[in-house]
């Protein structure tokens, strides 16, 4: 990552923490909910989001939802975070999702890796919302800005949440925030992975490390630099810059509500624009 970009992405993390904790707390209160529920995988994003949630409210619950493709290391790391946030046994639930996923796969009659992986992500979303309804909690998402921009999430899976506290922080920034919050270095440095199948890593699928990805995203979409400029500044081939830019463009549908075909004078989303928490 160019030093120029690193400096731009380095924030006042005590202030960021204070702001995000307050926003989580206020959103829960304004929504009329009693607390928040979160899925913890043992990765950097869910670890940081869990710490922030625990600082925002005592009323939190953590779901660990491993499958046969979940590395043991991830579960070990998840328990490190449970200890860090002082989560007693009443504050977390472990559910192996393999039986749920198997039933969906049987119904669909597929062994396709991608389809099965998306079923896993959507099964976790269903469980999170079931527990959220049980406790009258909000579902707190764990996605970061890098993943959201790239579309590197499952639509109505890990993308199906009520709030995204980390949604305006690049992966590089989430790692910085994690260090500030005391997240163990093994988690901070671990290669990100949705673990939807064995051996899956985000950087392996995308073809670049996140520091490079974040540099491209920042320079293209926040500083509006040209692809040629970015290629020179980040020292990566132009085709890789274009690949990242294309990933952002083709995933726009994941970041928007479903398209409504306009027939009236005032249609929802395009004209019907009221506050998210409208009272």
From Swiss-Prot:
SUPFAM superfamilies referenced in this protein's UniProt entry, alphabetically: Adenine nucleotide alpha hydrolases-like
Keywords: ATP-binding, Ligase, Magnesium, Metal-binding, NAD, Nucleotide-binding
Leader peptide range in chain numbering: none
Pfam family, one: NAD_synthase
Family: Belongs to the NAD synthetase family.
Family annotation (PANTHER family): GLUTAMINE-DEPENDENT NAD(+) SYNTHETASE (PTHR23090:SF9), NH 3 /GLUTAMINE-DEPENDENT NAD + SYNTHETASE (PTHR23090)
Known function: Catalyzes the ATP-dependent amidation of deamido-NAD to form NAD. Uses ammonia as a nitrogen source.
Listed NCBIfam families: nadE (TIGR00552), PRK13980.1 (NF010587)
Subunit relationships: Homodimer.
Protein name: NH(3)-dependent NAD(+) synthetase
Organism this protein belongs to: Sulfolobus acidocaldarius (strain ATCC 33909 / DSM 639 / JCM 8929 / NBRC 15157 / NCIMB 11770)
């Amino acid at each position: 990552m160019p030093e120029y970009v690193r400096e731009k992405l380095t924030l006042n993390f005590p202030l960021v923490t204070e702001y995000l904790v307050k926003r989580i707390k206020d959103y829960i209160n304004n929504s009329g909910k009693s607390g928040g529920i979160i899925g913890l995988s043992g990765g950097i994003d869910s670890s940081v989001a869990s710490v922030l949630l625990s600082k925002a409210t005592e009323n939190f619950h953590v779901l660990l939802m491993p499958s046969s493709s979940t590395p043991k290391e991830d579960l070990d790391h998840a328990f490190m975070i449970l200890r860090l946030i002082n989560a007693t046994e009443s504050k977390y639930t472990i559910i192996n999702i393999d039986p749920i996923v198997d039933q969906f796969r049987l119904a669909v009659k597929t062994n396709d890796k991608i389809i099965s992986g998306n079923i896993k992500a959507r099964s976790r979303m269903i469980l999170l919302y079931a527990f959220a309804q049980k406790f009258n909690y909000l579902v707190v998402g764990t996605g970061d800005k890098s993943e959201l921009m790239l579309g590197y999430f499952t639509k109505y899976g890990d993308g199906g949440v009520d709030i995204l506290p980390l949604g305006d922080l690049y992966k590089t920034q989430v790692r910085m925030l994690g260090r500030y919050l005391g997240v163990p270095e093994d988690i901070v440095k671990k290669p990100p992975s949705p673990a939807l199948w064995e051996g899956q890593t985000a950087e392996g699928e995308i073809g670049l490390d996140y520091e490079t990805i974040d540099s491209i995203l920042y320079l293209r979409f926040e500083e509006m630099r040209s692809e040629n400029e970015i290629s020179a500044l980040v020292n990566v081939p132009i085709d890789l810059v274009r690949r990242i830019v294309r990933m952002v463009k083709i995933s726009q549908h994941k970041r928007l509500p479903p398209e409504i075909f306009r027939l009236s004078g005032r249609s929802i989303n395009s004209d019907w624009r009221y506050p998210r928490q409208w009272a």
